[in-house]
């Protein structure tokens, strides 16, 4: 039964126009323009367009000139009876007012409505059926029974249609949209709801996410091993769980059996089995084994703590990370079943230390909790310092620094305090002995300053070249020696005074390094 059939439950203005409502003016419940309002402003009576030529009515109703099947006789555009008449009062053709009659293929070329992206049917010459509708109408409209009941006839009426059951208009509007956008469902997609993603998509996304998470955990464990490899007793290796195994609980927790229960070891099996898998020959029923494994994995009690540092060798590290995945996917562990680990005691038996291992069962994805807490316990602070980061001290650092400083116990009071001792710091860059450099605190040498070998009894009170050179000598590293035979004023930019200064100054005797140090300290 069509949505537009005669029924008193449907409002009258939603019924098809084949009823008596089409003979009367449009009811006041809706507001809309007439398609054929050629007589706007005139006193001529309005003729229902269903009795006229449907093509002419459609051409005059649109607000753009369209080609006609008849020959144009040169009639005026303003002539209401002409074929090229354009109605300036009609609504413009927008996406909400697209109206295509059932016989548009007869009078227009196929490229007329190319802007609407209308999908025409494959039949080139549509054949008319008994009730006047074409086969193309049936293919676009829907079922032939729905077409025969009169849902199509509302398109040929005099008034603007206001029905909700127009399947054809919905398809035309969908065809006019751009369906090439990948993020949206195209109009060809038939689904109950676009928000319901199918289960295979969800499964594939979940598998991808779990595999990616497994790779991230492997990278994290590699970084962890690199970070703790310099410790005194680093963990030997980190056993990784397989996360994307089917029917595996997530996150996988390491299974450690309780202290009062020793799991039955199957010595007959060639391969070590995980502890959480119940052995059929075990006297313990399978349900209690699963319950104990779940309780050990989920429950966290702070009294559980690894017992001894000496017992956490490679065997206990291998058996401390038993996870509940399949036998075939599980790597072969050598001593997995040979040693049970009941080494858990209460915290009151051990001295209270700063323990980082607050959640002993919580780090299934990085490493075994015993190995991590054991490596972190080697980082305990010194007993006398309250800081968690102990100061890094080396045994021979201060001795090396003190050996560079010249020791003079007798002449401590005569040391010039204004001269800093840079012997234990970074040495100044080595200067070639041909061009002497001077310290920044002393002035540059001038010609008025007396030379080195003048025979003056005492050095002057003003800072002279000799004082500056001795200060610079104290700043230099001990392996750098300076030749003082050259004149001090040779670095002056005046080239004329160089030969005269060389002839005036007698050569100075070069002293040994010990004499220079004594001169500095005196």
From Swiss-Prot:
Transmembrane segments: none annotated. Residues 27-46, 66-76, 131-146, 335-349, 363-396, 404-431 have a biased composition (Polar residues). One of its GO terms (biological process) is maintenance of protein location in cell cortex of cell tip. GO terms for cellular component: cell cortex of cell tip; cell division site; cell tip; cytoplasmic side of plasma membrane; plasma membrane of cell tip. Residues 1-83, 119-158, 170-192, 251-285, 300-516 are annotated as: Disordered. Residues 258-285, 439-452 have a biased composition (Low complexity). It is found in: Cell membrane. GO terms for molecular function: protein-membrane adaptor activity. Coiled coil: none annotated. It comes from the Eukaryota. It is a peripheral membrane protein. Keywords: Cell membrane, Membrane, Phosphoprotein. Residues 308-318, 472-482, 495-516 have a biased composition (Basic and acidic residues). The modification Phosphoserine is found at residues 43, 303, 350. With tea1, acts in a positive-feedback loop in the microtubule-mediated regulation of cell polarity. Involved in the anchoring of tea1 at the cortex as well as the correct localization of tea3. Interacts with tea1 and tea3. This is Cell polarity protein mod5. It comes from Schizosaccharomyces pombe (strain 972 / ATCC 24843). The lineage of its organism: Eukaryota, Fungi, Dikarya, Ascomycota, Taphrinomycotina.
């Amino acid at each position: 039964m069509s949505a537009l059939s005669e029924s008193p439950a449907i409002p009258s203005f939603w019924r098809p126009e084949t009823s008596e409502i089409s003979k009367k003016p449009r009811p006041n419940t809706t507001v809309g323009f007439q398609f054929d309002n050629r007589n706007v402003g005139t006193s001529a009576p309005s003729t229902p367009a269903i009795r006229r030529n449907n093509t002419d009515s459609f051409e005059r109703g649109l607000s753009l000139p369209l080609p006609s099947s008849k020959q144009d006789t040169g009639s005026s555009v303003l002539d209401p009876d002409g074929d090229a008449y354009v109605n300036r009062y009609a609504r413009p053709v927008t996406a909400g007012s697209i109206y295509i009659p059932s016989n548009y293929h007869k009078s227009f070329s196929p490229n007329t409505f190319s802007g609407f992206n209308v999908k025409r049917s494959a039949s080139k010459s549509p054949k008319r059926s008994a009730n006047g509708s074409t086969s193309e109408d049936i293919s676009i409209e829907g079922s032939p029974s729905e077409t025969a009941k009169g849902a199509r006839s509302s398109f040929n009426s005099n008034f603007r249609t206001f029905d909700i059951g127009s399947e054809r208009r919905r398809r035309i509007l969908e065809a006019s949209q751009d369906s090439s956008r990948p993020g949206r469902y195209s109009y060809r997609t038939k689904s109950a709801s676009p928000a319901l993603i199918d289960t295979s998509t969800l499964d594939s996304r979940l598998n991808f996410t779990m595999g990616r998470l497994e790779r991230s955990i492997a990278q994290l464990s590699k970084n962890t091993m690199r970070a703790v490899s310099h410790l005194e007793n680093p963990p030997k290796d980190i056993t990784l769980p397989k996360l994307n195994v089917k029917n595996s609980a997530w996150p996988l927790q390491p299974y450690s059996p309780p202290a009062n229960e020793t799991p039955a070891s199957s010595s007959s099996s060639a391969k070590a089995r995980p502890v959480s898998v119940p052995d059929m020959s075990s006297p313990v029923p399978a349900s209690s084994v699963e319950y104990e494994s779940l309780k050990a994995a989920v429950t966290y009690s702070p009294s559980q703590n690894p017992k001894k540092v000496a017992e956490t060798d490679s065997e206990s590290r291998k058996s401390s990370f038993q996870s509940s995945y399949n036998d075939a996917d599980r790597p072969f562990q050598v001593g997995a079943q040979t040693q049970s680990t009941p080494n858990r005691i209460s915290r009151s038996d051990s001295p209270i230390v700063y323990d980082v291992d607050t959640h002993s069962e919580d780090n299934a994805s990085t490493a075994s909790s015993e190995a991590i807490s054991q490596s972190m316990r080697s980082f305990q602070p010194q007993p006398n310092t309250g800081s968690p980061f102990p100061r890094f001290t080396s045994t021979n650092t201060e001795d090396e620094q003190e050996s560079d400083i010249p020791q003079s116990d007798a002449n401590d009071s005569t040391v010039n305090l204004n001269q800093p001792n840079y012997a234990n710091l970074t040495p100044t860059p080595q200067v070639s002995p041909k061009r002497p450099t001077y310290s920044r605190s002393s002035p540059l040498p001038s010609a008025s300053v007396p030379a080195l070998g003048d025979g003056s009894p005492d050095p002057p009170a003003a800072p002279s070249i000799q004082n500056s050179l001795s200060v610079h000598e104290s700043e230099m590293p001990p392996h750098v020696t300076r030749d003082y035979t050259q004149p001090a004023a040779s670095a002056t930019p005046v080239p004329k005074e160089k030969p005269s200064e060389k002839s005036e100054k007698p050569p100075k005797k070069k002293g040994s390094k010990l004499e220079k140090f004594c001169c500095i300290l005196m």
